[in-house]
Structures are given as C-alpha cells and as structure tokens.
C-alpha cells in the first residue's frame, strides 16, 4: 500500500500539505525531510537516510520509536475497539489511566478530564477555572494572570494567556484580557544578572501586589519551571512554590502547564514535585503516550470538581467535550508508557544523562556565536547571537537557527530550533554515546557559522 517514489511524495507534500509553524513559500523552495519509519532514537526518511531524533519529534517521544510494549498496547486494544465515546459512557483504558495519573500526580489532584493535545488541556483548565467561580456564585472574576513570553498552545484561549509577540500578536483583537508579569528569566537576567533568591522575591512581590489589590482574578497560569517555547527560559529557584503560596493566601486558583515538562523531561515525573507544588489544575500532554498518539489531560481537585455537581436542571455541569475525549487506543498506550517508566527505571537511568548534558553544555560557552546556554533537567537551549560582546542577535529573516539545524542534518542529527535557539530535547532513553554525537555535531555546526558571518 502507498508504494510511491520519493519524488512524487515530495511533490504532493508541497502541493497539498500546509505544515504547522512553517513558511510554506520557503518550505517549497527547500529539500525537506519526509520520515518513513523509526526505531529507538532513530528515524529514517524516504531515501533511507538515518537521523537521531534529537527533539523527540517535537518533545513528545519518551522511550524511543517502535517500542515493543507500546506497539503491543496499541495492537491489543485495536483488536478490541479503536474508539468509543466518553460523553455519558466510559471505557476500560480511560478509567485505568485516570486512576494511574492521580496516583503519580501531586497530592490533591484527584480528577482527570481528557482531551487530545496540550493546548486543549490548557483551554479546559481556563474554562473550568472560570466556570468554577460562576458555579460558586462569585461574580466579577474574569481576568487571568500570566507571564510575558508564555506559551500554552495555539487555540484562542491558550493564546490569550500566552505572551510571545511573534506567535500571538496577530490575534490580539480576538483575545480575552490578562495581566502579564515579566518573564522570570529575562527579568532576573536584566535586573540582577542571574537567577537568584532576590529576583524570586521581587517577582513574587509584584504578583502579591496584584492579588491583594484586585478581586477579579480567576487564576494564575504558568508553565512548570521553564518557558520552553520562549527558548528554554528557566524560572529562578522557588518561584513556582512562591506563586502557589500566594494563590492560596489570596484564594486564587493556580493552573500549572506541565505539557512540555511532564513525564520526565526535568528529571522527575512532573516538575511540580521538585518544588512541592500541588496546583488546582495541572495540564498534561506531549509525553503522556510516549509520543505515540494524541492525548492530553487536565487534572484538578475535588474542590473544583464538586463545584460542578448538582441536579440536572441546575445546569452546573461542565459543557465541554471532544469527539475523541478519552480515546481507547490513546489511553491504552499511555498506560503502557507509564508501565515502561517503572519497568525500565527510566527516571533513575536519566539522572547521569542530565549530569552529562550539564557538563557538555559548558563547552558551548566557548563558541563565538553562542550568547547563552540554558538547561532544566533534560531540556536545553543554546542561543545563537551575531555578536557575543554586544548581545546582538542575528536578523530574524536570516533563519540562522535553521541553517545550523540543516548542517546537523548532514551528519544525521534531526533538530528544530526555536528561532535562533538550538533546542536539545532528546528521548529519555538515548544512550550517552548517542548524546555525545548529537552534542559534537551541534558544536561543529555552530562553528561552521564562523565561516559565513
């Protein structure tokens, strides 16, 4: 089936397929990768060329491609039933997964609402938080507090609480109102020169000043420990915990977006664990199925859930749902994903790799066109600059990050930058020699810039 020559596939790809976050005029002018199969941390394109998947297929692959246990989970469920609705009915894998997610999540997050991707998980949290206050009879709450440089997905609600001008500015007239605190990393670096307790205290005071002076705040929403899509911008120590303490003090809800950070990316199952934070909502996606199928989840508390209980005629229930909510196949592979974490001791084996990554990242500071190096757990960003001394960036239109990524492709490493930030988000199961090859290749590709600039 589908035995087509590569040239035909390339032609049809450019003729019919509109790709996400892609300037299609440029895409049509270039040679692009069309992947056909994967095994472990490797991908093969339609010409049989092999690449290390150094971005985990956009940060979602956990245990590698074509994992036998995950494959089997999908096939076993497929032989039973692929999908049944969860609107007023249920299915076995969705029930089992909900129980398991509650068991591994911060204490108090006892209810699970499914969706298909991280933006939807955030959208659901936004609507639930707003609806919660309505059901409680509290009037006038219609404002969210978020962060500059935030990214929570691309649906209108998620964009409203976002803060990346390049991605979100076009849609500003469509969006609901928010209050934005400064990006913690950028604020700390500009004012204090580093991430430090003094900066944490400064940011928390700004938040407290808002919370104690307003009664219209629905919730505070932020990513967990790092603003990943903004270029891997980590939070100062204790910031997330401090925010949680303030939301409790001022009776405000807290939404934590663990879509990018969840399922081991920061070294623990969820970043919230590292600061002892249990929010009112936790949004999950990406790695929840090990990178196999679209699935996301919004976890919340009994307090929130109970506010939606009532007689049918009261119409308190949550009017939200998708066709594939709690899909049987996706929930089955998500369960297998969590079993692999336990059986293969994934998080335990990850710790020396995080240490190796930290050590190897120091080498990038020596490079002429590297202006900053950032890391949280197994997530890293290397920022490229035209002039290190002046902090001058490359012009956006030069696509310098993509040029470096294309160089890496020549040596069999698949990367996708965030602007001019080279992102390393490797599958958790990558071996240390494979890590070293990725890092060596990226260093070489950045050095090649010196010949062009």
Swiss-Prot record:
> In which pathway is this protein known to take part?
Cofactor biosynthesis; biotin biosynthesis; 7,8-diaminononanoate from 8-amino-7-oxononanoate (SAM route): step 1/1
Recorded source organism is Aquifex aeolicus (strain VF5)
* EC number(s) given by UniProt: 2.6.1.62
What is a biological process (GO) this protein takes part in? Answer: biotin biosynthetic process
Q: What is this protein called?
A: Adenosylmethionine-8-amino-7-oxononanoate aminotransferase
Q: Where in the cell is it found?
A: Cytoplasm
Role of this protein: Catalyzes the transfer of the alpha-amino group from S-adenosyl-L-methionine (SAM) to 7-keto-8-aminopelargonic acid (KAPA) to form 7,8-diaminopelargonic acid (DAPA). It is the only aminotransferase known to utilize SAM as an amino donor.
Q: Where does pyridoxal 5'-phosphate bind?
A: 118-119, 257
Highest taxon of the source? Bacteria
Q: Which positions does the site annotation Participates in the substrate recognition with KAPA and in a stacking interaction with the adenine ring of SAM cover?
A: 21
Instruction: Name the top EC class.
Output: transferase
User: What residues does substrate bind to?
Assistant: 151, 286, 321, 416
